[in-house]
Every structure is written in structure tokens, then in C-alpha cells.
UniProtKB/Swiss-Prot annotation:
<dbReference type="InterPro" id="IPR015422">
    <property type="entry name" value="PyrdxlP-dep_Trfase_small"/>
</dbReference>
<comment type="subunit">
    <text>Homodimer.</text>
</comment>
<dbReference type="InterPro" id="IPR015424">
    <property type="entry name" value="PyrdxlP-dep_Trfase"/>
</dbReference>
<dbReference type="InterPro" id="IPR049704">
    <property type="entry name" value="Aminotrans_3_PPA_site"/>
</dbReference>
<dbReference type="GO" id="GO:0042286">
    <property type="term" value="F:glutamate-1-semialdehyde 2,1-aminomutase activity"/>
</dbReference>
<keyword id="KW-0663">Pyridoxal phosphate</keyword>
<feature type="modified residue" description="N6-(pyridoxal phosphate)lysine">
    <location>
        <position position="265"/>
    </location>
</feature>
<dbReference type="InterPro" id="IPR015421">
    <property type="entry name" value="PyrdxlP-dep_Trfase_major"/>
</dbReference>
<dbReference type="Pfam" id="PF00202">
    <property type="entry name" value="Aminotran_3"/>
</dbReference>
<keyword id="KW-0413">Isomerase</keyword>
<dbReference type="GO" id="GO:0008483">
    <property type="term" value="F:transaminase activity"/>
</dbReference>
<dbReference type="GO" id="GO:0030170">
    <property type="term" value="F:pyridoxal phosphate binding"/>
</dbReference>
<keyword id="KW-0963">Cytoplasm</keyword>
<comment type="pathway">
    <text>Porphyrin-containing compound metabolism; protoporphyrin-IX biosynthesis; 5-aminolevulinate from L-glutamyl-tRNA(Glu): step 2/2.</text>
</comment>
<dbReference type="InterPro" id="IPR004639">
    <property type="entry name" value="4pyrrol_synth_GluAld_NH2Trfase"/>
</dbReference>
<keyword id="KW-0627">Porphyrin biosynthesis</keyword>
<dbReference type="GO" id="GO:0005737">
    <property type="term" value="C:cytoplasm"/>
</dbReference>
């Protein structure tokens, strides 16, 4: 047995499923998950000593590549001053100033410890600010594991949501309406059914948890218009897209102004950080200045703030996002070319430093139904053959891939060459 197999066997006796987040268990592709020893730049190194070109990037944060010296040094320096104080620090102020400067729609920002905390808190704030209970989310979008978000669509577009996890009370789920991503008709129907009850829409501007689905041109502006028409708030969940699709996020890339924004992943530079913020009048409703409660023992942790501050300063340097886009475009085009040579039907969506690979005969993939019609079994074979080639993709047909500026042209070319060999075997 490999060392990864031995560790996985031991882990399953001690940790549910052997992992601390379900997708890591390889249940979406089968087999034994890799246990990682270290990472540097664009590469992961497993406990058995094998190197992989990494397109998971810790599920998004590693936009600069692994073990970036500026972030590593910032963490070391902060740790030498203390690990946690439970009191305000100068770095929290500097971090808030940096974030609000980089994302102009955020007049104020509150730091938390995860993307789930950010979305959960933003929704509570929207409900408190509007005095309404219902929310709209989209089928196939993921916003963390808060109870109100673990909800699937009912039997029709206007039926109340149903829990999609045991432990979520139906009374919670009934306030969540699930619409179809990239379909404004379904959203308008929900508002017309409940015109005075919907507090907010929460949306991934690029859906990254049904692989990678960019918005149609009219979708995000249409959501903004519907929120304005019916008095609801628009929450854009940029946990995945923030500082990746563009410096000011996908909201800037697509030209839409939210009321609240949720951030995570890149904002922590690899440390556990989330944030939410937006309009000053809305944020003023948050405790201690307002009645909507939110708190966190480790929120604004000095080491996490130091890591995030260092990361964002690097990400804000000229040329970063142009490089990300060029590398991702080169990879997407190369994969499509290699697939065509092998007569493999393939769609590759990409925007900024995100991409998604779909085995499908369709010309495009734009919504959850399109994703579910793709060939998941072929993806599973593709994943494992690429892993044998030393390329680590997301171990699920429903997760986006991530590029970093640490990836080289050689890494991209090697990945395309590996895919060419794999396509020949499919």
C-alpha cells in the first residue's frame, strides 16, 4: 500500500470519511485521495514523493501559487508578535482599508473566518435590514453550509424549498426559493409570487460549484434590476471569484453593483479568512452599531490578516490578472484542440483564472441542467488518467479548476500534452 492509502485507512477510523471537507475524499471520482506533504509554486507533492501540476489551488486561494514568499514571511513576522489577542489591531484597519479600496462597492467590511460565515452573516444582515424572511438562491450554486443554504428546489419553480441535508429543518428551508441560474424568468416569477417577502438574492457571479458557468450577458444586470424593482438586496458571493476574475471581482468584470459582497479564499492568502461588506447604510445595521448580531472569537486574527494583506498587495500588482487570463485561455484552447484531435466531445468554460471541463456533445454549458447532462463517468476516467500523468485536477465533475500566476508556459504545455495522451485512451 502507498503511504496515502495507509493514511487514508487510519484517517477513516478517526475522521468522518477520513477528511475534514467531503470533496477531498474523492467520492466524486473514486479511489484514494492524495495526502499532501508540501506544495510550492504550481506544484503539490504527495506523501509518496510524487509531484503534480496543481489546478485545485487549495480550492481557489492560491492565485499566486503555493508557499509564496511574501505571504510566508508576513505570517512568520505576525506569529512572532502573538497568535491571537481578542482585541482590535492596526492590521485589521489596514486590511479593511485595502479591501474597500480594491472593491469600490464595499463602503464597509466585516472580517470573519470563512466563506460560510460571510454568506450566512450577509443573509442575516439582509433579512434584518429589509425586515423580510425569504431569500433567492440558484440551483447548482453553493454558498457554504449554513442551514438556509442547504436547500434544493421544490417540485416546481414557485414551490418552497426542501432541505437537501438531514439536520436542516423544513421550517428553515421554506424561506429559501431556488431559481434557475442564467434564467431571469424564474427569478421574476419568484418575486411576483412573493413581492413583499424576499429579502435578498444571493448569487455566484460565476457559478463555480457546478464546475464553471459564467453568467449570460443579461443575467447579473437583470438580477440588479429585479432587486431594485421589488426592494430586495443583491448579494454577490465572490468567495471564489473575488480578486481572481478581476482585481475588483466578477462584479467589476461584468459591470454590476451589489448591495453586499461576500469574500473568502484569496482574501486570506491561504489562511482561514472570509469577509462581507457593502453599502454603508446596510452595514450600519450590524452590531455593535445596529441590531443585527454577528461575532467571532478569531475574526480579524492577526496572523490571518497579515497573510491576507500580503496576498492582496501582491494580487494588486499590474499584470497579474492579464497573466491569469492568458494562461487559462492557453490551457482551455489547448485542451479543446487535443480533444478534437481525438474526436472527444468537450466544452471548456473559462473566465479569468477559473475554468471548467465538460464532456458533452452540447455546444455550450450554461446552467445546472446542462451540467447534469454531461458525461460524469468519462470525467472520472479522465481525472485518474491525468493524475497518473502528474496533473491534479479537481476530484469532481462539478468543481471549477483554478490557475495561478506561478504556472509557467511549460506547465501549461505539459498539461496539454498529458491530456492529449489521456484523450487517446478515452
Amino acid at each position: 500500500m502507498s503511504k496515502s492509502e495507509n493514511l487514508y485507512s487510519a484517517a477513516r477510523e478517526l475522521i468522518p470519511g477520513g477528511v475534514n471537507s467531503p470533496v477531498r475524499a474523492f467520492t466524486g471520482v473514486g479511489g484514494t485521495p492524495l495526502f499532501i506533504e508540501k506544495a510550492d509554486g504550481a506544484y503539490l507533492y504527495d506523501v509518496d514523493g510524487k509531484a503534480y501540476i496543481d489546478y485545485v489551488g487549495s480550492w481557489g486561494p492560491m492565485v499566486l501559487g503555493h508557499n509564496h514568499p511574501a505571504i510566508r514571511n508576513a505570517v512568520i513576522e505576525a506569529a512572532e508578535r502573538g497568535l491571537s489577542f481578542g482585541a482590535p489591531t492596526e492590521m485589521e484597519v489596514k486590511m479593511a482599508e485595502l479591501v474597500t479600496n480594491l472593491v469600490p462597492t464595499m463602503d464597509m467590511v466585516r472580517m470573519v473566518n470563512s466563506g460560510t460565515e460571510a454568506t450566512m452573516s450577509a443573509i442575516r444582515l439582509a433579512r434584518g435590514f429589509t425586515g423580510r424572511d425569504k431569500i433567492i438562491k440558484f440551483e447548482g450554486c453553493y454558498h457554504g453550509h449554513a442551514d438556509c443554504l442547504l436547500v434544493k428546489a421544490g417540485s416546481g419553480a414557485l414551490t418552497l424549498g426542501q432541505p437537501n441535508s438531514p439536520g436542516v429543518p423544513a421550517d428553515f428551508a421554506k424561506h429559501t426559493l431556488t431559481c434557475t441560474y442564467n434564467d431571469l424568468t424564474s427569478v421574476r416569477a419568484a418575486f411576483e409570487q412573493y413581492p413583499q417577502e424576499i429579502a435578498c438574492i444571493i448569487v455566484e457571479p460565476v457559478a463555480g460549484n457546478m464546475n464553471c458557468i459564467p453568467p449570460l450577458p443579461e443575467f447579473l444586470p437583470g438580477l440588479r434590476a429585479l432587486c431594485d424593482e421589488f426592494g430586495a438586496l443583491l448579494i454577490i458571493d465572490e468567495v471564489m471569484t473575488g480578486f481572481r476574475v478581476a482585481l475588483a471581482g466578477a462584479q467589476d468584470y461584468y459591470g454590476v453593483v451589489p448591495d453586499l459582497t461576500c469574500l473568502g479564499k484569496i482574501i486570506g492568502g491561504g489562511m482561514p479568512v472570509g469577509a462581507f461588506g457593502g453599502r454603508r447604510d446596510v452595514m450600519d445595521a450590524l452590531a455593535p452599531t445596529g441590531p443585527v448580531y454577528q461575532a467571532g472569537t478569531l475574526s480579524g486574527n492577526p496572523i490571518a490578516m497579515a497573510a491576507g494583506f500580503a496576498c492582496l498587495n501582491e494580487v494588486a500588482q499590474p499584470g497579474i490578472h492579464e497573466t491569469l487570463d492568458e494562461l487559462t485561455t492557453r490551457l482551455a484552447e489547448g485542451l479543446l484542440e487535443a480533444a478534437e484531435e481525438a474526436n472527444i466531445p468537450l466544452v471548456v468554460n473559462h473566465v479569468g483564472g477559473m475554468f471548467g471541463i465538460f464532456f458533452t456533445d452540447a455546444e455550450s454549458v450554461t446552467c445546472y441542467q446542462d451540467v447534469m447532462a454531461c458525461d460524469v463517468e468519462r470525467f472520472k476516467r479522465f481525472f485518474h488518467l491525468m493524475l497518473e500523468e502528474g496533473v491534479y485536477l479537481a476530484p469532481s465533475a462539478f468543481e471549477a479548476g483554478f490557475m495561478s500566476v506561478a504556472h509557467s508556459e511549460e506547465d501549461i504545455n505539459n498539461t496539454i500534452d498529458a491530456a492529449r495522451r489521456v484523450f487517446a485512451k478515452l
